[in-house]
Every structure is written in C-alpha cells, then in structure tokens.
Amino acid sequence: ESHDCSVDVCYNTAIPIGVANKYDAVVLSPGPGLPEESGDLKVFVAEFLGEIPILGVCLGMQALAVQLGGTLYNQQVVKHGVQESIITKRGVLFSQDDSEFEVGLYHSWAVSKEGDYTITAESKNGTVMALENKSLRCYGVQFHPESILTPKGMEILENFLEEVAVETPISAE
C-alpha cells in the first residue's frame, strides 16, 4: 500500500475467481508447498493468465512456469534464508543486462529453463531466478523481493507497478 495502491490479501483457498478481473494486477505470494497443493492457485493462474498482469513470487513464479509449460524440480541444496548473487537480463523487472545483485532465497524447488517464457535472471549455478512472458503480462521471481536479504527488492516491485500502470492504470482508493 506504500505506492498508493489498494491491496486485498486473499488466502489461496479463497481466491475470488469470479471477481479477479476487478483488479488491475495480482501478486501471487510465496508458499509453502507446490502449486498443485496450494488451494485455488492453479485454477486462478489458468483462468487469469493473460487477462490481468501477474507477478509471481517464489511459489507464485512456480505456478506461472508450470502453466506456461515449464516443470519443477527439487533442488539438491535447499536454500532457506540464504543470500546469493543473481545475474539479470533486461526485462520488465530489471532495467539492465548483466546486472549482478544479492537476493534472499527461501526455496527447495526450482523451475526448468524450458517453457513459454523468457528467463530474465539466473543464479551463478544456472538456476532460473526470474522469468517473464510479456505478451501474457506475467512476471516471476524465485527469490523474495520483500526480504531484507534483497536490497533491490522494492525497485523490482516498483518496476512491476510501472509496467502495470503503463498498460492498466493502477486504481488507488
């Protein structure tokens, strides 16, 4: 709500499927669990992908990736409360190519590189850390922009809001 945005928080078992189009954008929050174990998450993504801008964070990105033809795999090394460097490519969420910065990780699953999306950030070991499908207006980050371990987190969220505002004015109440 710090950017004059009106915010509703919904449990994944009570996502307002029938009225979701009243929103200018949606942020799909972190887990725990997998997309298929997360209430109405997969149903919501299937119904509204391409209808309204969506930013997926961690589990939210995984749900977007699966809907876009990607797969999930269990990482050999679990990353909970770990800060790592990522390398970005220019996209909606990142303003520069080959920018490197620290992000906070809290996950044990990752997404494949194959899917109907462009990879916009990777860890140094090649794990997908961000993706986008601009034509469907969906964007995802595997890391946590809301974490203190992600110093540029607010900038990433602002980039999403700016993209949404260009395409669909953000309503403020």
Regions found by a protein language model. Give the residues of each.
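A short beta-strand-loop structural module common to alpha/beta enzyme folds
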Residues: 5-15
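Structural signature of beta-strand start/N-cap positions in the alpha/beta core
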Residues: 6, 24, 53-55, 102, ...
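Short loop/edge segments at beta-strand edges and connector loops
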Residues: 11-13, 74, 105, 121
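Short amphipathic alpha-helix with an adjacent loop that forms part of the alpha/beta core around
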Residues: 14-23
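Cysteine-nucleophile active-site neighborhood
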Residues: 23-95, 157-159
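Conserved hydrophobic/aromatic beta-strand scaffold that supports enzyme active sites
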Residues: 83-85, 128-130, 140
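Catalytic beta-strand/loop cores that center a nucleophilic Ser/Cys/Thr
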Residues: 92-135
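Acyltransferase
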Residues: 148-173
